[in-house]
Amino acid sequence: TLDTSNPQLMGIARYFNNKVTSATGFEIPVEKHGNIEFKLTDDTALSAEGYRLQVKHGDIIITAHQPAGIFYGVQTLLQMLPPEIKSSREQKGIDWTIPCADITDKPQFAWRGLMLDVSRHWFTKEEVKKYIDELAEYKMNVFHWHLTDDQGWRLEIKSLPRLTEVGAWRAPRVGQWWQREPQQSGEETTYGGFYTQEDVKEVLAYAAERYVRVIPEIDVPGHSLAALVAYPDLACMKAPSAVGVGNKFYGEDENTLCVGKDATFEFMDKVLTEVAALFPDEYVHIGGDECFKGFWHKCPRCQARMKAENLKNEEELQSYFIHRMGDLLKSKGKKLVGW
């Protein structure tokens, strides 16, 4: 039972049906009067994501102030079923019963997230969706998508095609990263992949149906080796010739954008323009961690920038860069978040 004119409740009903049909073989019709009721209330005591789940003899009622609460109530309901409910095939001989209960629940924290690093190890679009399913099952509501790093640039930027033509691919390696053989001369870069902007839109829609926000991370100014391989003019000294396989230690290969070059800020403007247009969330994560400043210390352009901006040291140069990224994102209607 639900308001069939509410598209969000209808979406949750379809989600619930998809979760139970494979294992049980039951087809549960969506009707105006049924034994499972999704009910929205004006009572704000449950908060935006809280719910009340009542399991009675022959009836199940989930009450919430917002559709997100109904969705989380469904997660609890699914967890009360026998574990065979997770099967993708019909399970015979299972007693599909739920114990009677009266549960009132709401989250303690508004931001409940997990990160997935798709740079060091490539995950396909379908694998990302499975990860989002796991977040939703545990009532997580933020997916932090670590899209770029030294070992691969995973997001299509249409104005900068080499980021994915070159930066998304490396030599195939497995094992402990510090024990990996470096890429050999002439070796093909066959490991990797990237998400087209259409792929991202599909993932965003999938996440929204599960009440999961998606926060993209573009890790700069450090952790930028893959970007420097694609666009070597953005390096302070000499950009690496190949995307990292993970065999180098911090500071060995140049992996930091040159903050002394105006071209770096033009590059970031192009990247963040497309990121801001693609991702609907108010936040964009720019990393900012583990920025090796030894390259800046030796770079005449970075030293000139420090002098021109009256910056005392390379730490202040990084702060200068971060502030410029914040202003850039603000101009695009976004807020900066970082490590």
What are these regions, as identified by a protein language model?
Residues P107, Q151-E209, S224-E266, G294-S319:
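Aromatic- and acidic-residue-enriched carbohydrate-binding clefts of CAZyme catalytic domains
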Residues D117-D150:
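A conserved hydrophobic secondary-structure block that centers on an alpha-helix together
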Residues Q66, L114, L135, V214, ...:
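Conserved, mostly hydrophobic/aromatic
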Residues G113-E127, T256-A263:
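Active-site mouth loops of central-metabolism enzymes
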